[in-house]
Curated annotation (Swiss-Prot):
Pfam families in the record: B-prop_COPA_B_2nd (PF04053), TPR_COPA_B (PF23953), WD40 (PF00400)
Any coiled-coil regions, as ranges: 866-890
Modified residues (N6-acetyllysine): K627
Keyword DNA-binding belongs to the record: no
PROSITE patterns: WD_REPEATS_2 (PS50082), WD_REPEATS_REGION (PS50294)
Role noted for this protein: The coatomer is a cytosolic protein complex that binds to dilysine motifs and reversibly associates with Golgi non-clathrin-coated vesicles, which further mediate biosynthetic protein transport from the ER, via the Golgi up to the trans Golgi network. Coatomer complex is required for budding from Golgi membranes, and is essential for the retrograde Golgi-to-ER transport of dilysine-tagged proteins. This coatomer complex protein, essential for Golgi budding and vesicular trafficking, is a selective binding protein (RACK) for protein kinase C, epsilon type. It binds to Golgi membranes in a GTP-dependent manner.
Protein name: Coatomer subunit beta'
Disordered: annotated segments: 837-863
Residues bearing the modification Phosphoserine: S859
InterPro entries for the chain: Beta-prop_COPA/B_2nd (IPR006692), Coatomer_complex_subunit (IPR050844), COPB2 (IPR016453), G-protein_beta_WD-40_rep (IPR020472), TPR_COPA_B (IPR056176), WD40/YVTN_repeat-like_dom_sf (IPR015943), WD40_repeat_dom_sf (IPR036322), WD40_rpt (IPR001680)
Length: 906
């Protein structure tokens, strides 16, 4: 089949005329030497200019990377060779190499040598380990030596192209050429070796507009390629693909098949004359140099021609050589996820065509090799030719004995047991075909599915697929497009019913043939089904699987990998890369079987599979169950305490949540469980949870809401002990234990608040608190401390104090016992009461009232003296006036001080 050369431009770098290009073997860099004397390094992944070397003012006709030394070596029209370190941009060395323009540089792949050619008709060998001494001079050409290239299969041999119309092949160590190839009518500009092991070929391009292929063993021209309209300036065998790339001063780059010599493609990017080309082993990138800049294009698919059967036998093609490896041969060797497998490779022979794709049939007995417009079906064991033919595309059916080929853009043929069974023309043409349970045909109008047996249209879908993957059962299918993928269910029973009755058939087929299960916005590169689980590699190099609407990431890949298959008995998934390295990742078949059973709602089967799932994998399964809505089963399966606790909360399983909270000893969990217990009216459990969580605020809310005075009392003591002073204060206050509130404020140094509390609720304690406040404040501000008026000394500043003593005593006697919460509706709210009025007529006991009036305290705390002589009162007033006159009031709020009217008048 024709080469499917997807050609994508990766970089366009506008610049002055480009005389040579090179690609770095490990970095994403392109080197371009310019006619204006500069050398540039471009990053073709980021499309940015990363380095520039100002070499000289004359054209730089040659530049090469020496990656093992971190060098760029340049040759210019000033006859100088310059060596730069491309990391530091420092010039490492410079010397005069020739007596005329330097045309080409070739770097030896293993030795510390470079070869240079020049218009002085000489080729020179330089050894950088010997201080860049000239080790050898090769004489023989009679005109400019335009290019030299080292033989990749024999590093001691190189070839040269000259304007004397000849190609000479040389040996290192010999000053005269081995032989000369003649055939061009004009000067030869370029030359290259074929790197494959099957052909001893050279290619050359000349000013006679021809490209010639030479057999350098027989010293004959085997092919001449015609097509360019001007001088051929560059020609190259691609090191990976079966193609020849030629560039000309006519502005075109032509791509030829290296086996058939058929012209496959012509590129013209409108950048004037083409001067140079560069490619790299292991890469599909090709660099091109033009008059107006340089371009990098990516040719073809990087996906390797590789396939694996269900038993672990892998077949791949390395160029035209077919090789095999068997995973069984590894035995019980330990395999680590993502590591390259040490496989023993066996040569199976060469293929008559260049393989672009290799694919086993479903039962693994046969393998088809496609390429060059042909297909060959071999036996998988011995690679014996079973069948062959011409085709643009090939697809296996679900039935191993059946397959289809796309003969042209309008004809599809179906074969059974290697014999043609049916040929048909799809209504809207055939741009591509897809195998599987149904035959898929893509056209400009969309995708059409046909029955393999009778080619009846099953369903037409307006979609442009890239890949189609069928499950083994034929129930599920994944259709992958350029931007997303769809999971569909094939309703075969409905299709059979319609085929029998022919009812409900439209021009687009059977409407109910498929049911859409989901669309995922992710690009699928390669994929396969295991049960009802779709495993795939994505465009961002993730290895995922999709089941039941959930995407699970198995691994993050460090490079592009291609799925080969899954072997259930190994519980491993196998992938390969473009270098034909095989890696694997663990994926338990029991997990996939369980998820498949759940998706089919076959819980009896799921219960049978569950014991085979290792404990470390059960939490993953539980998350899957949760997402499917089976939270009760997820709670049973999960082994992660965090996950189980969350599920228990969601399901209201108090006992399980309590056990998990006890094991975890987490305050957060106790709080969450307390909320659940309150919502379930389990107040005893809620109290215990809040206690474990040390949530005193929550306990206070619970205690007050339930009217539990004993709980409030214990909470007050506990909160005070643990330093939760706000909760302790509120707990004491709610119980009417104002004296305890006061002592708490004093102990915590909140003396101003204590003074106001005492003035409001415990006037008998005001004097003591003010004294403590004054002592404390004097350490900071003596004047502010002196401004505090003690009620024992300035009784006139505290009107109603005597009555307050009486009210305090009345409150103590009448509110000694707490009222039951059930009497709350009968109690007058505090804001509606006048305690002074209620206490009228109350006579405090003699022992207390008389002591207060006589100035003798009833308790160790000081109280205000009830009466003073007139002289003492007058003296006190005078002293206060003097104090007030001498006091600077700084940040003192006097708005709440009640002064007597006569003092205000004075």
């Amino acid at each position: 089949m024709p080469l499917r050369l997807d050609i994508k431009r990766k970089l366009t770098a506008r610049s002055d005329r480009v005389k040579s290009v090179d690609l770095h073997p490990t970095e994403p860099w392109m080197l371009a030497s310019l006619y204006n004397g500069s050398v540039c390094v471009w990053n073709h992944e980021t499309q940015t200019l990363v380095k520039t070397f100002e070499v000289c003012d004359l054209p730089v006709r040659a530049a090469k990377f020496v990656a093992r030394k971190n060098w760029v070596v340049t040759g210019a029209d000033d006859m100088q060779i310059r060596v730069f370190n491309y990391n530091t941009l420092e010039r490492v060395h410079m010397f005069e190499a020739h007596s005329d323009y330097i045309r080409c540089i070739a770097v030896h792949p293993t030795q510390p040598f470079i070869l240079t050619s020049s218009d002085d008709m000489l080729i020179k060998l330089w050894d950088w380990d010997k201080k860049w001494s000239c080790s050898q001079v090769f004489e023989g050409h009679t005109h400019y030596v335009m290019q030299i290239v080292i033989n990749p299969k024999d590093n001691n041999q190189f070839a040269s192209a000259s304007l004397d119309r000849t190609i000479k092949v040389w040996q290192l160590g010999s000053s005269s050429p081995n032989f000369t190839l003649e055939g061009h009518e004009k000067g030869v500009n370029c030359i290259d070796y074929y790197s494959g092991g099957d052909k001893p070929y050279l290619i050359s391009g000349a000013d006679d507009r021809l490209v010639k292929i030479w057999d350098y063993q027989n010293k004959t021209c085997v092919q001449t390629l015609e097509g360019h309209a001007q001088n051929v300036s560059c020609a190259s065998f691609h090191p990976e693909l079966p193609i020849i790339i030629t560039g000309s001063e006519d502005g075109t780059v032509r791509i030829w098949h290296s086996s058939t010599y058929r012209l496959e493609s012509t590129l013209n990017y409108g950048m004037e004359r083409v001067w140079c080309v560069a490619s790299l082993r292991g890469s599909n990138n090709v660099a091109l140099g033009y008059d107006e800049g340089s371009i990098i294009v990516k040719l073809g698919r990087e996906e390797p021609a590789m396939s694996m059967d269900a038993n672990g036998k892998i077949i791949w093609a390395k160029h035209s050589e077919v090789q095999q490896a068997n995973l069984k041969a590894m035995g019980d060797a330990e395999i680590k996820d993502g590591e390259r497998l040490p496989l023993a490779v066996k040569d199976m022979g060469s293929c008559e065509i260049y393989p672009q794709t290799i694919q086993h049939n479903p039962n693994g007995r046969f393998v088809v090799v496609c390429g060059d417009g042909e297909y060959i079906i071999y036996t998988a064991m011995a690679l014996r030719n079973k069948s062959f033919g011409s085709a643009q595309e090939f697809a296996w059916a679900h039935d191993s004995s059946e397959y289809a080929i796309r003969e042209s853009n309008s004809i599809v043929k179906i074969f059974k047991n290697f014999k043609e069974k049916k040929s048909f023309k799809p209504d809207f043409g055939a741009e591509s075909i897809y195998g599987g349970f149904l035959l898929g045909v893509r056209s400009v109008n969309g995708l059409a599915f046909y029955d393999w047996d009778n080619t009846e249209l099953i369903r037409r879908i307006e979609i442009q697929p890239k890949h189609i993957f069928w499950s083994d059962s034929g129930e599920l299918v994944c259709i992958a497009t350029e931007e997303s993928f769809f999971i569909l269910k094939y309703l075969s029973e409905k299709v059979l019913a319609v085929q029998e009755t022919h009812e409900g058939v439209t021009e687009d087929g059977i409407e109910d043939a498929f049911e859409v299960l989901g669309e995922i916005q992710e690009i699928v590169k390669t994929g396969l089904w295991v049960g009802d689980c779709f495993i795939y590699t994505s465009s961002v190099n993730r290895l995922n699987y999709y089941v039941g609407g959930e995407i699970v990431t198995i691994a993050h890949l460090d490079r592009t990998m291609y799925l080969l298959g899954y072997i259930p008995k190994d519980n491993r998934l196998y992938l390969g890369d473009k270098e034909l390295n095989i890696v694997s990742y663990s994926l338990l078949v029991s997990v996939l079987e369980y998820q498949t059973a759940v998706m089919r709602r076959d819980f009896s089967m799921a219960d049978k599979v569950l014991p085979t799932i290792p404990k470390e994998q059960r939490t993953r399964v539980a998350h899957f169950l949760e997402k499917q809505g089976f939270k009760q089963q997820a709670l049973t399966v999960s082994t992660d305490p965090e996950h189980r606790f969350e599920l228990a909360l969601q399901l209201g399983e108090l006992k399980i949540a309590y056990q998990l909270a006890v094991e975890a000893e987490s305050e957060q969990k106790w709080k969450q469980l307390a909320e659940l217990a309150i919502s379930k009216c389990q107040f005893g459990l809620a109290q215990e949870c809040l206690h474990h969580a040390q949530d005193y605020g929550g306990l206070l809310l619970l205690a007050t809401a339930s009217g539990n005075a004993n709980m409030v009392n214990k909470l007050a003591e506990g909160a005070e002990r643990d330093g939760k002073n706000n909760v302790a204060f509120m707990s004491y206050f709610l119980q009417g234990k104002v004296d305890a509130c006061l002592e708490l404020l004093i102990r915590t140094g909140r003396l101003p608040e204590a003074a106001f509390l005492a003035r409001t609720y415990l006037p008998s304690q005001v004097s003591r608190v003010v004294k403590l406040w004054r002592e404390n404040l004097s350490k900071v501000n003596q004047k502010a401390a002196e401004s505090l008026a003690d009620p024992t000394e300035y009784e006139n500043l505290f009107p109603g104090l005597k009555e307050a003593f009486v009210v305090e005593e009345w409150v103590k006697e009448t509110h000694a016992e707490l009222w039951p919460a059930k009497q709350y509706p009968l109690v007058t709210p505090n804001e509606e009461r006048n305690v002074m009025e209620e206490a009228k007529g109350f006579q405090p006991s003699r022992s207390t009232a008389q002591q207060e009036l006589d100035g003798k305290p009833a308790s160790p705390t000081p109280v205000i003296v009830a009466s003073h002589t007139a002289n003492k009162e007058e003296k006190s007033l005078l002293e206060l006036e003097v104090d007030l006159d001498n006091l600077e009031l700084v940040d003192i709020d006097t708005t709440d001080i009640n002064l007597d009217e006569d003092i205000l008048d004075d």
